[in-house]
């Protein structure tokens, strides 16, 4: 059994639903910095209280406080994706209206907005179960062009740059310095030196009941508007505009293969023959190198 604990400040509705929990420092039980944050916010009709949470990371989350701590553990880089149990986490998180004045309940939000408008313009960032990561955790050594594009529970390694059109879901992210201009779906990891090009997509495990975990190895390149539905080893390239799924027929070494049979292979370029239209895989002799100036964060 692996345990983790932290003290944080929780936001509760008048009916006791937990809207959020912020754990500023993993492992700390010091309440002194959080005490001034406790109290009632009548405009939002919520109460903020200090909580201390201890969990078994090998077991499934048991309540909302537990679920929030697991998301913090990922974004604080205490646990890598897939090394902490997140079974059933969706059912433990409440749908929340995320505003510039803090989280609000969905029920009755029209009146909540009216009360908050006395403080100034009310901006709604999203209505979702997951907030923006940077509102709770700002990892060292990363750049994020658009805070709305990275969910709490994302794991961003030192040296990662997420450009404005990049996206990183929870329980997913980068294991080393990487350029993210495309979408890293839930459950996906990309390793050191990999470049996810603009508009590129990596197939996740949430949609359609998918169970296969997709990962990209070191020094890979997904070209602009390409897609990847199989794990890649190191030094692989998918050319711009080409989407590789598990069932894609690929000409490799003189015969046709399902792309799934090449999963995890190192040193391949996947491209479409511009004359025949056939997807082919050939040995990669190129070396993908990131611009170090863009990753000295």
From Swiss-Prot:
Record bears the keyword RNA-binding: no
UniProt keyword Ribosomal protein present: no
Family per similarity comment: Belongs to the type 2 tetrahydrodipicolinate N-succinyltransferase family.
Entry's EC annotation: 2.3.1.117
Oligomer and partners: Homotrimer.
Record-level Gene Ontology MF annotations: 2,3,4,5-tetrahydropyridine-2,6-dicarboxylate N-succinyltransferase activity; magnesium ion binding
Entry function: Catalyzes the conversion of the cyclic tetrahydrodipicolinate (THDP) into the acyclic N-succinyl-L-2-amino-6-oxopimelate using succinyl-CoA.
Pathway: Amino-acid biosynthesis; L-lysine biosynthesis via DAP pathway; LL-2,6-diaminopimelate from (S)-tetrahydrodipicolinate (succinylase route): step 1/3
A cellular-component GO term for this protein: cytoplasm
Signal sequence, renumbered to the chain: none
Binding site for Mg(2+) 2: 165
Annotated InterPro entries: DapD_actinobacteria, Hexapep, THDPS_M, THDPS_M_sf, Trimer_LpxA-like_sf, Type2_DapD
Catalytic class of the enzyme: transferase
Active site: 181
UniProt: succinyl-CoA binding residues: 183, 198, 201, 224, 239-240, 247, 258, 271-274
Catalyzed reactions per annotation: (S)-2,3,4,5-tetrahydrodipicolinate + succinyl-CoA + H2O = (S)-2-succinylamino-6-oxoheptanedioate + CoA
UniProt superkingdom: Bacteria
Keyword line: Acyltransferase, Amino-acid biosynthesis, Cytoplasm, Diaminopimelate biosynthesis, Lysine biosynthesis, Magnesium, Metal-binding, Transferase
Subcellular location: Cytoplasm
Record-level GO BP terms: diaminopimelate biosynthetic process; lysine biosynthetic process via diaminopimelate
Primary location class: cytoplasm
Protein name (database record): 2,3,4,5-tetrahydropyridine-2,6-dicarboxylate N-succinyltransferase
Gene name per UniProt: dapD
Binding site for Mg(2+) 1: 148
């Amino acid at each position: 059994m692996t345990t983790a604990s932290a003290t944080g400040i929780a936001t509760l509705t008048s009916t006791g639903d937990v809207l959020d929990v912020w754990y500023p420092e993993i492992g700390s039980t010091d309440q002194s910095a959080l005490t001034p944050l406790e109290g009632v916010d009548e405009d939002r009709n919520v109460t903020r209280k200090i909580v201390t949470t201890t969990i078994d990371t090998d077991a499934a989350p048991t309540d909302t406080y537990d679920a929030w701590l697991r998301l913090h553990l990922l974004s604080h880089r205490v646990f890598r994706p897939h090394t902490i149990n997140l079974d059933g986490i969706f059912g433990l998180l409440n749908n929340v209206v995320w505003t510039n004045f803090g989280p609000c309940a969905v029920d009755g939000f029209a009146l909540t907005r009216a009360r908050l408008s006395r403080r100034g313009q009310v901006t709604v960032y999203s209505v979702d179960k997951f907030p923006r990561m940077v509102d709770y955790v700002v990892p060292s050594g990363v750049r994020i062009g658009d805070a709305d594009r990275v969910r709490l529970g994302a794991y961003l390694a030192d040296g990662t740059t997420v450009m404005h059109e990049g996206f990183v879901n929870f329980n997913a992210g980068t294991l080393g310095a990487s350029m993210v201009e495309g979408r890293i779906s839930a459950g996906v990891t990309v390793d050191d030196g990999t470049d996810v090009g603009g508009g590129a997509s990596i197939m996740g495990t949430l949609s359609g009941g998918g169970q296969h975990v997709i990962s990209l190895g070191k020094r890979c390149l997904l070209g602009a508007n390409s897609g990847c539905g199989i794990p890649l080893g190191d030094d692989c390239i998918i050319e711009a505009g080409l989407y590789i799924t598990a069932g894609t027929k690929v000409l490799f070494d003189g015969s046709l293969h399902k792309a799934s049979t090449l999963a995890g292979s190192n040193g391949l370029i996947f491209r479409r023959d511009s004359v025949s239209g056939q997807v082919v895989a050939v040995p990669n002799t190129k070396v993908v190198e990131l611009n170090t100036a863009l990753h000295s964060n």
